């Protein structure tokens, strides 16, 4: 799936299985009349196939507020089911016409089950204080449970993971927070946010406790265990070049031009320490999209960065996880959801449990591979693996005494 500017906002290509693709955009029935930014895929109605959500930044929601949530009909076609949720809008004015409208500023959607009821909820990161928590009401509709806790002013990217290993999913939002900009009178420059899940989808703002507020002009972000110690670390790419021709505005934006990426290493006590320069994760280009995965399959997580106006960057992790072990798990799902998106993978190591939920389209303008990479430290085996497959059928796969340092593929029980 690709999105772009111009009259054709969307293109969808089917993989033919032989290295070629076929354009099936028209057959899907998805006809966007406004530009789309990030895309998320998830089975929100738990009927076995993957549905889609499109974020539409800086678009007029007055005339046509739909085109967000597309329900898969099981035959490669989709219908617009956006009436089941309400997207927050902000009153704005088109400068060229002085026309006022209700503007949408959503940027990064993520399907994730934050209240542990198996139904994927929707975490929607938005600019200008428009981020939302939309709780899935058993596949019927979504209930807006956004509270004052969600205080990010300029949400751009997002990442979701269980960073404190307590069995539920937490939410990080990248935003704007340069030390110089914080001295300016701009309310939007208040930094990142980390929302810690206290259970059943009840969040608290743990940003200051965790020490992750500062990340310049943040975009793509990802949770990944870069040192294989069993705790999810956090990587964020930054940078912005002002587009305004007004000198006063452009001068403000130039402070973000060469902002470095930040690597927050999880200390295992609900706090993080920024160590990007120390560990060689140095990146000062205009980062946007980000994928964190083991691209060279050597047992540790690397970074692939899509840059604005420049070639991509690969940061290869060669030493940070040295001596620490891992277990990488991919799932083979059923035909309509072959990667088992929405499944939960649990492992137990020395009586400690860790969990990763498989997500698709979970980064700003990008996505990680659909796999679960666990660092297990110095452990010599994984005591148990438990797969909770997506859906309401209650399918479970369990394994014991699993060998470390391997890439494991686990098929669905019905395969």
Question: Where are the regions that the model predicts?
Answer:
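Beta-rich catalytic cores
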Residues: 8, 35-40, 65, 105, ...
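Beta-propeller blade termini
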Residues: 14, 27, 35-46, 105-116, ...
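Acidic carboxylate motifs that coordinate Ca2+ or other divalent cations, activating on Asp/Glu
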Residues: 47, 51, 117, 121, ...
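Blade-edge motifs of beta-propeller repeat domains
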Residues: 13-34, 70-104, 135-153, 184, ...
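Short, conserved, GDST-rich strand-edge loop motifs in beta-rich repeat architectures
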Residues: 55-64, 174-188, 237-256
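Gly/Ser/Thr/Pro-enriched helix-cap/hinge segments flanking short amphipathic alpha-helices
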Residues: 271-415
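Hydrophobic beta-strand segments that make up the repeating blades of beta-propeller
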Residues: 1-4, 52-56, 121-126, 171-175, ...
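Solenoidal tandem-repeat scaffolds enriched in leucines and small polar residues
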Residues: 31-132, 153
């Amino acid at each position: 799936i690709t999105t772009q500017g111009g009259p054709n906002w969307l293109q969808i290509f089917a993989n033919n299985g032989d290295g070629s693709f076929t354009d099936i955009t028209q057959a899907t029935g998805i006809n966007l009349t406004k530009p789309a930014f990030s895309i998320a895929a998830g089975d929100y109605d738990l009927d076995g196939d993957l549905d889609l959500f499109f974020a539409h930044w800086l678009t007029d929601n007055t005339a046509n507020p739909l085109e967000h949530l597309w329900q898969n009909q099981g035959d490669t076609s989709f219908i617009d089911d956006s009436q089941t949720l309400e997207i927050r809008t902000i009153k704005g004015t088109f400068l060229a016409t002085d026309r006022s409208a209700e503007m949408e500023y959503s940027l990064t959607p993520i399907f994730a089950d934050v209240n542990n009821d198996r139904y994927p909820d929707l975490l929607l990161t938005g600019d200008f204080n428009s981020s939302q928590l939309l709780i899935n009401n058993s596949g019927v509709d979504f209930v807006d449970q956004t509270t004052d806790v969600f205080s990010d002013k300029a949400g751009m990217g997002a990442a979701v993971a269980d960073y404190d290993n307590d069995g539920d999913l937490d939410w990080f939002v990248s935003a704007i927070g340069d030390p110089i900009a914080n001295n300016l009178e701009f309310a939007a420059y208040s930094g990142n946010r980390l929302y810690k899940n206290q259970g059943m989808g009840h969040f608290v703002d743990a940003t200051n406790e965790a020490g992750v507020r500062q990340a310049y002009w943040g975009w793509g972000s990802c949770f990944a265990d870069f040192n294989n110690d069993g705790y999810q670390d956090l990587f964020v790419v930054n940078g912005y070049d002002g587009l305004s021709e007004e000198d006063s505005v452009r001068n403000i934006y130039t402070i973000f031009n060469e902002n470095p990426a930040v690597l927050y290493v999880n200390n295992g006590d609900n706090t993080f320490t920024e160590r990007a320069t120390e560990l060689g994760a140095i990146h000062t280009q205009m980062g946007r999209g980000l994928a964190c995965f083991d691209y060279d399959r050597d047992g540790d997580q690397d970074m692939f960065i899509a840059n604005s106006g420049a070639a991509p960057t690969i940061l290869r992790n060669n030493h940070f996880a040295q001596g620490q072990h891992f277990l990488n798990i991919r799932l083979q799902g059923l035909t309509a959801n072959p990667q088992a998106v929405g499944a939960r993978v649990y492992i137990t190591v020395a009586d400690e449990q860790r969990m990763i939920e498989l997500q698709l389209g979970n980064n700003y303008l990008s996505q990680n591979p659909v796999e679960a990479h666990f660092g297990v430290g110095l452990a010599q085996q994984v005591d148990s693996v438990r797969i909770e497959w997506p859906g309401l059928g209650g399918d479970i796969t369990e394994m014991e005494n699993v060998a470390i340092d391997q890439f494991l593929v686990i098929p669905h029980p019905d395969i």
